[in-house]
């Protein structure tokens, strides 16, 4: 018994000496803040969404062109994503918080983040009315000179909160009954699309107060052909696609809004074969080349927001299709970087298992059997040639529904 205790004591002593020697050479890692390079020209991109089923912790993730995760932002309950400044190294997020996590007093803020460190710089309180929606484009927009941020509200009464980013203060709230999705059209002019097919034109003065407001005559019939609100801008032109697979070009500026042109995205034969628009954020525009990218699939017309399998590319001048890009996975959202050598980004749903096993699960359990296995991934393509470049299959769990080039 005594010898056994002595052996234990010697063993403990040797471990203490060994660990002491190891600790003597140990240099603790110092916590710090990484600083990102300039994002311009890097083909970096963000993805964001509600982070379902954990909607109280909305997320936005930053990736580089090689698929490396560079950072993330936690953007409050049911993220509406980010608004990216082109003039300042700043990012803006309209965020919702509750004093007890999922209950209690609600507070809405515009959070301003440093684009190099992703650290919060300051908050601007706004009315606790910010709209939350699956389609997040047009819910928060910058004026062209980036002085003001406009935030869409829904209580269910519709209104706009005006925020002065220079003075870091809430200016005022403007009712816009029956209208939604905001589109900037100059330093002080904005439009919101309305349920009757017209637009609400809002003009601000230099302090951010309302200088004038008016409703336009209807430009389209929403009962015959409903425009999707995910518009894309090129100068003073905005491009939309409709539920019946048409493209619309609208000119918006300080003088007013006017329909410029419209054309069909599909031929009669393609329409009869079931081809149509797809996805939650299924359109993108490369401004320099004038190319419109539209996510498409074969399905029933009423399923126009289900995932897509191809991206069709159109010349907005000739209104002709230039290419069809077959996707590796089913996509819910696309984005296209600007400048030379653009990238096409596809935010996809996938089952990370062999295809035969996936087919067996679908045949035996249908959509309900596949749903628990679904994960999200990203695929990158050369937007000029359609060549697949790489896949990013290991993105965090949670429903992401926007991919946005930075």
Segments from the language model and where they lie:
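N-terminal signal peptide c-region/cleavage motif recognized by signal peptidases
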Residues: 18-22
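Bacterial N-terminal signal peptides that target proteins for export
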Residues: 2-10
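Predominantly soluble domains enriched in secretory-pathway, periplasmic, or organellar proteins
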Residues: 23-406
